[in-house]
Amino acid sequence: MKSATLVLLSFLFLIACNSEKEAGDAAQNSPRIKKQTRLVSPKINAEYVLGDVVAFKIESETPVDSIVLEYEGKESVYLEKEFDWKAELGKTGIQKLKVSVYCQDLSETHYPKIIFFSDVTPTKTGYQVLQTLPHDPTAYTQGLFFMEDTLVESTGQKGESRLSKINLKTAQVYSSTSLASQYFGEGSTIWKDQIYQLTWTSHTGFVYDLNLKQKQTFSYPHEGWGITTFGDTLIVSDGTETLHLIDPRDFSEVGKLEVYTDKSKVMNLNELEMIDGILYANVWLEEVIVSIDPKSGKVLSVIDMSGLDDRFESDDAEAYNGIAYHAGRKEIYVTGKLWPNLFQVKFIPKN
């Protein structure tokens, strides 16, 4: 009986091994489904300048009925396998397109990815100091903006992050609220009757009323660096070249911009400020501000802010950060992390 059982088990084992081998061979020899169409041009990550015409070429083993190109929610229909396309929106950076090829009963989709550089060379700009004012040397500045005549500043560092209303002339803090110790505060801005403040890596933002009373929180999937207001949209930087466009009502992301010059992308975008319809951004660890077209992402000017920290003495002062614009008086103020001074400046052409 024991011998018969061993024979039966051996037989079943051989069957199982053969079945696994056949299944493995079948999977290995299974032909990969081959596409009937191929996107020949443009190549992936092909580089263009805004305004360039992009040449598309499709190869197909069967006659093509039509080709539909989709970009930013708009569709364009072509009847030939080779056609030219020009982006109407004119946004810099990586642009993702969808190309659907229709051949009789068959449809196949391709996702070309191309890069647009700016079509303008940024102007070189400098600055002139118009006024030197006091600034709290313990403030690790991350955000700076005006609420009418009141200067509002958000600061960083865990356990030290706060949002404060400040007297512009004396640097006296006359109203302030602190974040919980687990949060590293970042940029801040105002939209209508609400103030928005980011945190660095906690993926959490805070909404306050005009008296700095917290009303609610919101979340976002990326790091939070700088934030400013452009009409009914919040523009948020995350330390890369990407700017996130956020609806302040429901905090949904309604778009993105990638910031490019005519030669390269601009990384480390930090504190943001809108000045007369143009976006200005500090570049982290550089003594530079870039001005940006908020609709296209292209850099319009590079402002050299070097030498500003030579105007004070401090062993603790860190990176230049913070731009505030008083729209009524057309005044621009800048400072830095742990700086003892706030400067009113004017941007001027640089030879």
Regions found by a protein language model. Give the residues of each.
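Short loop/turn segments that connect beta-strands within beta-propeller blades
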Residues: 166-171, 209-213, 248-251, 293-297, ...
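Beta-strand-rich domains and repeat architectures in extracellular enzymes and scaffolds
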Residues: 130-162, 176-189, 336
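Conserved beta-strand positions in repeat-built beta-propeller and related beta-rich domains
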Residues: 153-157, 197-202, 236-240, 281-285, ...
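Short, compositionally biased P/S/T/A/G/V-rich stretches that sit at domain boundaries
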Residues: 18-49
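Surface-exposed, short loops/turns at beta-strand junctions within beta-sandwich domains
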Residues: 86-95
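A short helix->beta-strand "capping" segment at the edge of beta-propeller domains
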Residues: 118-137, 168-174
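C-terminal motif of bacterial Sec signal peptides marking the signal peptidase cleavage site
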Residues: 14-16
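Beta-rich, blade/repeat-based domains predominating
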Residues: 137-148, 181-191, 220-231, 263-275, ...
